[in-house]
Amino acid sequence: MSWQAYVDDHLMCDVGDGNTPASAAIIGHDGSVWAQSANFPQLKPEEVTGIMNDFNEAGFLAPTGLFLGGTKYMVIQGESGAVIRGKKGSGGATLKKTGQAIVIGIYDEPMTPGQCNLVVERLGDYLLEQGL
């Protein structure tokens, strides 16, 4: 299966009631884009560095916030070294780190944070099981 198929079929999928993430991507730890939805924001190198720093040192992004394509998200409870969650108004983002990649989902209402977490973390867990 291509990386784009993972994004299209497993991240940008209907989670019920017609809700889908607003955008999603799978990127390498170096920030290289493996696959993304059409409207996923272009990440800046310093944003990827901040994300990786937070995965390596929990709480790194808390003082400054999580930035994705220049949009700031308030960092909320995640899982140290594995999951970063951000909130912005009625939307937010979930990031799951695997051995080689970062799975990212960005959502807006009516999708709930829990629905986005489920979609992103389920794919991330699968990739981890596959050694990716």
Swiss-Prot record:
PANTHER family: PROFILIN, PROFILIN-3. Its main location: cytoplasm. The keyword Calcium does not apply. Belongs to the profilin family. Binds to actin and affects the structure of the cytoskeleton. At high concentrations, profilin prevents the polymerization of actin, whereas it enhances it at low concentrations. By binding to PIP2, it inhibits the formation of IP3 and DG. It is found in: Cytoplasm, Cytoskeleton. This is Profilin-1. GO terms for molecular function: actin monomer binding. Keywords: Actin-binding, Allergen, Cytoplasm, Cytoskeleton. The gene is PRO1. Occurs in many kinds of cells as a complex with monomeric actin in a 1:1 ratio. The keyword Secreted does not apply. GO terms for cellular component: cell cortex; cytoskeleton.
